[in-house]
């Protein structure tokens, strides 16, 4: 037998089953389910709608409403019915997802233990299933809202967060899933991905962080207190590197010749003393300040003596 699974994105998951008669099956097993067809559904084809197994106790609710929604659908066109394969000896189970126009189907072998509920047979063409984006009348929308207003979520385990869609994993067809108590939410109040704050909401992160400034004192003199790790990333003064005697001699000789250096002279001194041009410039600045202090100090001492 072949089974089609029709899943609506924003409605409850309904299953549409198609029974295809295989040569090795008995016609008496399906004779009771073919009584309500009145000639529209042949003995080898039967479509049935049942609720998704994950809906649990709400499956009966969908079954009561589906008769009023699809009661006016007729099937004069028998060309849309899937003919049973004459050469296949084993039936198969197929299900698909009609999201948009294409139909994606899968098939499972008949060896799986499929528990199917038998209901009165009816044929529903593919055009009768309205997509969520299509316009529907108000009366039909309200009736469909009562039928398909199931929102997969855990009603009692946690509080639902607005803006997040709870997607339940479909159980295996061959297994017997446990009944779930899903929350019943009206369809009119549903807003697709309506986030409360939005993804682009600004998050304020304070840059200032309080740090402990107290020093831990150990009773043992050999133990060195740990410094905070932030100090390693903080830019501080470089350790003073003293110049060698040869470097100082070269710098003093150039300073005696001229207290101010040019660009070419700075490059030449940098190459001769193996110092950077910045170091040479800073040394000349400090040397001028030192000489100025020495002159001012000598003048003050001379004025004090007189």
Swiss-Prot record:
Gene Ontology, cellular component aspect: nucleus
Main subcellular location of this protein, as a coarse class: nucleus
Cysteines paired by S-S bonds: none
Gene3D superfamilies: Homeodomain-like
Residues of the DNA-binding region: 236-295
Entry-linked PROSITE patterns: HOMEOBOX_1, HOMEOBOX_2
Location of the region described as Disordered in the Swiss-Prot/TrEMBL record: 68-90
GO molecular function, one term: DNA binding
Keyword Transcription regulation among UniProt keywords: yes
Membership in a protein family: Belongs to the Abd-B homeobox family.
Cited function: Sequence-specific transcription factor which is part of a developmental regulatory system that provides cells with specific positional identities on the anterior-posterior axis.
Designated name of the protein: Homeobox protein Hox-C13a
Organism: Takifugu rubripes
């Amino acid at each position: 037998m072949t089974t089609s699974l029709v899943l609506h994105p924003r409605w409850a998951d309904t299953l549409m089953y198609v029974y295809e008669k295989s040569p090795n099956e008995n016609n008496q097993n399906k004779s009771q389910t073919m009584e309500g067809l009145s000639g529209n559904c042949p003995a080898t084809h039967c479509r049935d709608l049942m609720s998704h197994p994950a809906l649990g106790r709400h499956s009966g609710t969908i079954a009561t409403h589906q008769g009023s929604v699809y009661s006016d659908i007729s099937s004069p066109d028998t060309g849309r019915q899937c003919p049973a394969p004459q050469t296949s000896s084993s039936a198969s189970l197929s299900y698909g997802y009609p999201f948009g126009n294409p139909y994606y189907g899968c098939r499972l072998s008949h060896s799986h233990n499929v528990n199917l509920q038998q209901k009165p047979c009816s044929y529903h063409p593919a055009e009768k299933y309205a997509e969520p984006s299509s316009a529907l009348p108000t009366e039909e929308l309200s009736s469909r809202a009562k039928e398909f207003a199931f929102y997969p979520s855990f009603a009692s385990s946690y509080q639902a967060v607005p803006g997040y869609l709870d997607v339940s994993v479909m159980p295996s067809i061959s297994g017997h899933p446990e009944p779930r108590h899903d929350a019943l939410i009206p369809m009119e109040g549903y807003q697709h991905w309506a986030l409360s704050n939005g993804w682009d909401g600004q998050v304020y992160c304070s840059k200032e962080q309080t740090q402990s400034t107290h020093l831990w004192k150990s009773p043992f003199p050999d133990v060195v207190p740990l410094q905070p790790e932030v100090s390693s990333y903080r830019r501080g003064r470089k350790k003073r590197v003293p110049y060698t005697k040869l470097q100082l001699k070269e710098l003093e000789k150039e300073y005696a010749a001229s207290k101010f250096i040019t660009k070419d002279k700075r490059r030449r001194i940098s190459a001769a003393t193996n110092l950077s041009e910045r170091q040479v410039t800073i040394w000349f600045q400090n040397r001028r300040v030192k000489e100025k202090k020495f002159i001012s100090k000598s003048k003050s001492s001379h004025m004090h003596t007189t």
